[in-house]
Protein backbone atom coordinates (compact mmCIF):
# COMPACT_ATOMS: atom_id res chain seq x y z
CA UNK A 1 0.00 0.00 0.00
CA UNK A 2 1.27 3.46 -0.84
CA UNK A 3 1.79 6.02 1.89
CA UNK A 4 -0.94 8.27 0.48
CA UNK A 5 -3.39 5.37 0.77
CA UNK A 6 -2.54 4.94 4.45
CA UNK A 7 -2.29 8.60 5.41
CA UNK A 8 -4.95 9.85 2.99
CA UNK A 9 -7.78 8.73 5.26
CA UNK A 10 -8.63 10.71 8.39
CA UNK A 11 -10.01 7.72 10.30
CA UNK A 12 -6.92 5.61 9.59
CA UNK A 13 -4.72 8.44 10.82
CA UNK A 14 -6.81 8.65 14.00
CA UNK A 15 -6.45 4.89 14.51
CA UNK A 16 -2.69 5.09 14.09
CA UNK A 17 -2.38 8.06 16.46
CA UNK A 18 -4.53 6.38 19.12
CA UNK A 19 -2.64 3.09 18.94
CA UNK A 20 0.67 4.93 19.03
CA UNK A 21 -0.47 6.65 22.23
CA UNK A 22 -2.30 3.75 23.92
CA UNK A 23 -0.29 0.73 22.77
CA UNK A 24 -3.14 -1.66 22.09
CA UNK A 25 -6.92 -1.47 22.12
CA UNK A 26 -9.91 -3.57 21.16
CA UNK A 27 -12.10 -2.77 18.18
CA UNK A 28 -14.96 -1.29 20.22
CA UNK A 29 -12.65 1.11 22.04
CA UNK A 30 -10.93 2.15 18.80
CA UNK A 31 -14.34 2.74 17.17
CA UNK A 32 -15.49 4.83 20.13
CA UNK A 33 -12.35 6.96 20.11
CA UNK A 34 -12.43 7.67 16.35
CA UNK A 35 -16.19 8.21 16.28
CA UNK A 36 -16.94 5.44 13.79
CA UNK A 37 -19.11 2.35 13.81
CA UNK A 38 -17.74 -1.15 14.34
CA UNK A 39 -17.95 -2.17 10.67
CA UNK A 40 -16.09 0.90 9.40
CA UNK A 41 -13.44 0.54 12.09
CA UNK A 42 -12.93 -3.14 11.24
CA UNK A 43 -12.51 -2.25 7.56
CA UNK A 44 -9.75 0.25 8.38
CA UNK A 45 -8.06 -2.14 10.81
CA UNK A 46 -8.09 -4.90 8.18
CA UNK A 47 -6.49 -2.60 5.60
CA UNK A 48 -3.75 -1.61 8.06
CA UNK A 49 -3.22 -5.20 9.18
CA UNK A 50 -3.14 -6.57 5.62
CA UNK A 51 -0.39 -4.06 4.87
CA UNK A 52 1.59 -5.26 7.88
CA UNK A 53 1.36 -1.99 9.80
CA UNK A 54 -0.87 -3.37 12.54
CA UNK A 55 -1.23 -6.79 14.07
CA UNK A 56 -3.73 -8.27 16.46
CA UNK A 57 -3.70 -10.76 19.27
CA UNK A 58 -6.61 -12.59 20.78
CA UNK A 59 -7.38 -12.19 24.46
CA UNK A 60 -10.14 -14.74 24.87
CA UNK A 61 -12.75 -13.58 22.38
CA UNK A 62 -11.42 -10.02 22.32
CA UNK A 63 -9.20 -8.94 19.45
CA UNK A 64 -6.57 -6.39 20.49
CA UNK A 65 -4.85 -4.31 17.82
CA UNK A 66 -1.38 -2.78 18.05
CA UNK A 67 1.49 -1.71 15.82
CA UNK A 68 3.43 -4.56 14.22
CA UNK A 69 6.83 -4.20 15.89
CA UNK A 70 8.46 -6.20 13.07
CA UNK A 71 7.28 -3.82 10.34
CA UNK A 72 9.55 -1.08 9.01
CA UNK A 73 6.44 0.75 7.77
CA UNK A 74 4.95 0.64 11.27
CA UNK A 75 8.16 2.00 12.78
CA UNK A 76 8.29 4.79 10.19
CA UNK A 77 4.66 5.76 10.86
CA UNK A 78 5.19 5.75 14.62
CA UNK A 79 8.25 7.95 14.20
CA UNK A 80 6.32 10.33 11.95
CA UNK A 81 3.46 10.60 14.47
CA UNK A 82 5.82 11.19 17.39
CA UNK A 83 7.87 13.81 15.54
CA UNK A 84 4.74 15.57 14.26
CA UNK A 85 3.25 15.75 17.75
CA UNK A 86 6.53 17.09 19.20
CA UNK A 87 6.55 19.78 16.52
CA UNK A 88 2.94 20.70 17.33
CA UNK A 89 3.75 20.95 21.04
CA UNK A 90 6.74 23.20 20.34
CA UNK A 91 4.53 25.35 18.13
CA UNK A 92 1.94 25.70 20.88
CA UNK A 93 4.62 26.57 23.43
CA UNK A 94 6.01 29.19 21.05
CA UNK A 95 2.55 30.74 20.54
CA UNK A 96 1.99 30.99 24.30
CA UNK A 97 5.11 33.10 24.88
Predicted regions and their residues:
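A short acidic, leucine-rich amphipathic alpha-helix
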Residues: 29-32
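Short, Lys/Arg-rich nucleic-acid/phosphate-binding segment
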Residues: 58-64, 70
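A short, conserved structural fragment
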Residues: 49-59
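Amphipathic alpha-helical dimerization/coiled-coil segments
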Residues: 69-97
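Short alpha-helical segments that sit at the start of domains
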Residues: 1-14
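Key DNA-contact positions within bacterial/archaeal DNA-binding proteins
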Residues: 39
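Short capping segments at the starts of secondary-structure elements
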Residues: 22-26
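Short, hydrophobic-biased segments on the C-terminal half of alpha helices
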Residues: 45-46
